[in-house]
Amino acid sequence: MFKEKVGKIILYPVYKFYEKILWNEIKNGPFPQHVGIIPDGNRRWARANNLSINDAYYSGYRKLKQVLLWLLEMGIKNITVFALSTENCDKRSNLELNTIFNYIKAGLEELLYGEIIYKYEVKVRAIGLIYKLPLDLLEVLNQLSKKTENFNKRKLTLAICYGGRQEIIDATKKIIADYEKGKIKLDDINENIFRQYLYDKELEDIDLVIRSSGEIRISNFLLWHIAYSELFFVDTYWPDFRKIDLWRAIRSYQKRKRNFGA
């Protein structure tokens, strides 16, 4: 542990120099309008460092606050975070879920009573099967949503107990219900109409998805909205995610030619 700390101290000037080089490469843009974050690897990080599950989610929670600030400082307008999947919401132990929910609540309270959301005028929304969330968490979430509902400069969307397939199924059910009531005709249904039935009809398509931990998959994340997204996978666990990892993702995005399926 001592050697590791000494190594970090020695390498810190090199890191800051590289950070400056990266920023100079990307600072003139273009920047993605909507960034999706899959913050993966908290538990594996804890195992690798002989730490507890609580330590894992606490460190992941702190990192998310940091990354959110980086994105806002860069001028990113829309940020969506995959906080908890439907699969994990159903399969994780009650103890682990309570730990996750407690940190989500703590994060929302920091946003509600802190300055960052109001400084950048960030609208905060949640999507997913949020009825599965504890009542105290729902209360804070509702307060924050209400407090920021008129902000329109930035948007933070939290996907909690969320699954992309489930969202599409739920949208389809709503369309069928409206069709049976005579509110919609089959010939009227297109992509724009279908979007109106998603959890958040105003949520824009994602330009760049960033996933940590080295896993190369999307894990049922916003399937409708990432049809033409650029994907970037980082070989580091979420608690160790660095600013240079974010900037490398942005640099990769800037170098790609987006053809939107054409």
Swiss-Prot record:
CDD domains: Cis_IPPS. Keywords: Magnesium, Metal-binding, Transferase. Its cofactor is Mg(2+). It is an enzyme of class 2 (transferase). The keyword Zinc does not apply. Binds 2 magnesium ions per subunit. The active site is at D40, N88. Mg(2+) binds at D40, E230. GO terms for molecular function: ditrans,polycis-polyprenyl diphosphate synthase [(2E,6E)-farnesyl diphosphate specific] activity; magnesium ion binding. It catalyses: geranylgeranyl diphosphate + 7 isopentenyl diphosphate = tri-trans,hepta-cis-undecaprenyl diphosphate + 7 diphosphate. One of its GO terms (biological process) is polyprenol biosynthetic process. Substrate binds at G41, N42, R43, R44, W45, S85, T86, E87, R92, R211, R217, I218, S219. Signal peptide: none annotated. Its EC number is 2.5.1.89. It comes from the Archaea. The keyword Transferase applies. Belongs to the UPP synthase family. HAMAP family: ISPT. Homodimer. Catalyzes the sequential condensation of isopentenyl diphosphate (IPP) with geranylgeranyl diphosphate (GGPP) to yield (2Z,6Z,10Z,14Z,18Z,22Z,26Z,30E,34E,38E)-undecaprenyl diphosphate (tritrans,heptacis-UPP). It is probably the precursor of glycosyl carrier lipids. This is Tritrans,polycis-undecaprenyl-diphosphate synthase (geranylgeranyl-diphosphate specific).
